């Protein structure tokens, strides 16, 4: 799939040298974004193939957060034709309970300034962490406006390595979940050595990136509408699970049609706009009555991209 990937590594310090392992993670993630269903037929989503502009900002192992932040800012500023960004890296440390991390705050700043959206992996537990001990998500998965993705097993349960929210006690993170592989079945990817199987939130997020890119670039929806449709499809009509601190609003359907279309007994309205301070809008939606009553149930999914400021708490 190399013809579908445009690779850039000019922001990596050449003095750090090259290790073959540096290419493994990015190659595996790219293989899912380009054509994940070719390797995982059961996850065929109907989105087709995507071209990827891949920017290497970190090497295998530990890296400088300052250098990564500087690189990401430069990349977004100089590639403003890209709206959907996939970010599969994260801290092994827990996000602080009472403040947004510098990494998360910068993603929120870039999203507000350039009208982009980041799909961020929900970060994994390490081999040293107990599977039974809760661990909060790490930076930059505490970004308020990013679409943060956790992983599930093939049994549609939180994967053993997933971490949990919330952020600042009231922002539900992760936002959503998707299959990322676990003990009962792993994800097939293309690695530098050929086809391999793996697991992790880094391999759940690219599937959501595919769906988000389809909604934005093929269906020409705004990032707000696209994000809202994905979360709405994940939440469904069922009560929120007790695992919502790990699953977010729910598990996203596999097929893109299940995000775009509704069953014959449902009607979906998408209302979108920009509201300034003190402005109010009223929408009259004609709904038939029966015996003087409205014989239906309704739910609303509200999605917005607030301007965040770490100095103000968010």
Regions found by a protein language model. Give the residues of each.
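Flexible loop/turn segments at secondary-structure boundaries
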Residues: 61-62, 92-96, 126-129, 155-157, ...
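Subtilisin-like serine protease catalytic core
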Residues: 1-11, 15-65, 115, 143-145, ...
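C-terminal subdomain of the subtilisin-like protease fold in secreted/lumenal serine endopeptidases
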Residues: 219-295
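Short beta-strand segments enriched in hydrophobic/aromatic residues
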Residues: 89-91, 122, 152-153, 302-306
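Extracellular S/T/G-rich loop segment that most often corresponds to the catalytic His/Ser-adjacent loop
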Residues: 1, 135-213
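Substrate-binding/access-modulating region of protease and related hydrolase catalytic domains
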Residues: 57-139, 197-199, 203-204
